[in-house]
Amino acid sequence: MADQRKAALDVAIRKIEKNFGKGSIMRMGDATDMKVASVSSGSLAIDKALGIGGYPRGRIVEIYGPESSGKTTVALHAVAEVQRQGGTAAYIDAENALDPQYAEALGVNIDDLLLSQPDSGEEGLEIADALISSGAVDLVIVDSVAALVPRAEIDGDMGDTHVGLQARLMSQALRKLSGEINKTKTIAIFINQIREKVGVMFGNPETTTGGRALKFYSTIRMEIRRAEQIKNGTDVIGNKAKVKIVKNKVAPPFKRCEVDIMYGEGISKTGELLDMAVENDLVDKSGAWYSYGSERIGQGRENAKKWLKEHPDSMNELMDKVRVANGMEPLNEKSTKETADDKASGKTGENKQETIEEASKE
């Protein structure tokens, strides 16, 4: 009986492959690489919270939160990281609010960035579809879902009601896009705004725009909220942002982290690197002094951050050590790798340079 079932299954598989092509169905054990490839978010803390070292390729990501919480900043850091690895990024600016100077300050090469400012939601999603289907774009960002206004609403009069029009538009678009996104291994990031549901007495009244479709199709949903101000004396120089991974299909969800978003600079990479290096015993903190290896790098957190910024080679080396210590692939072509013996013997600060393989990019 078991042999008959197996023979029937083999016949069915051959028939499917004949009708739809080789690889249309397979046993998961036959897959050459089942590991989900990822691209760094540009933030060590967020990469760790995501669980796989960055945003997964071929998947949909939703970033949402209140106004001025840092959603666009986080998305632009992803653009800079994709470009740093030699990839191509596209930005669909439905809000018409992208600041090129700020993007450049975050490390984005604006000369190579593909930018579209569509006149309607249909146009923006058609442009996204064309870019994704080309297979030549690594990252597409839609900023934002709330600004993808259906053409019927634009052509209508003020005050006209268009119930569920945007939700139907998003549902149709995502049905079409999800397959192409997976096939071309493109990362699609949708930035979204929050609204409040009327008449909710119990529970959270907040919801995101564009209906439920994006919630279902997203592999990762990331909530960003402003926590507190960062001050230098009396001057406000940035904000602390709390990031929560609300949904994650490729790693355990509900991880949280905090990032410093500095005005005109974006996410403070030196700050989060220093904090995580201390957590992993790669940087020694004794009182107010920070030491890396045999060298004292600064008294107080701000001075230690300044030292890292002034020594990019040491910063890149330390960043790769932190990534490896947290189970992530190193980013830089050359890095110091700490072996288990080194860690056990406390030699975490020695400068042993060794070449590592560049993170694979599918």
Curated annotation (Swiss-Prot):
Q: Which SUPFAM superfamilies match?
A: P-loop containing nucleoside triphosphate hydrolases, RecA protein, C-terminal domain
Can you provide one Gene Ontology molecular function annotated for this UniProt record? ATP binding
According to the UniProt record, where is the region Disordered? 323-362
Composition skew (Basic and acidic residues), residue ranges: 331-362
- What GO terms describe the biological role, i.e. biological process, of this protein? DNA recombination; DNA repair; SOS response
**Localization:** Cytoplasm
Give the record's GO CC terms.
cytosol
PROSITE patterns (alphabetical): RECA_1 (PS00321), RECA_2 (PS50162), RECA_3 (PS50163)
- Alphabetic keyword roster: ATP-binding, Cytoplasm, DNA damage, DNA recombination, DNA repair, DNA-binding, Nucleotide-binding, SOS response
Short name of one Pfam family: RecA
Residue positions annotated to bind ATP are G65, P66, E67, S68, S69, G70, K71, T72
The record's section on HAMAP family has: RecA
User: What functional role does this protein have?
Assistant: Can catalyze the hydrolysis of ATP in the presence of single-stranded DNA, the ATP-dependent uptake of single-stranded DNA by duplex DNA, and the ATP-dependent hybridization of homologous single-stranded DNAs. It interacts with LexA causing its activation and leading to its autocatalytic cleavage.
Query: What does the sequence similarity comment in the record state about its family?
Result: Belongs to the RecA family.
The identity of this protein, by name, is: Protein RecA
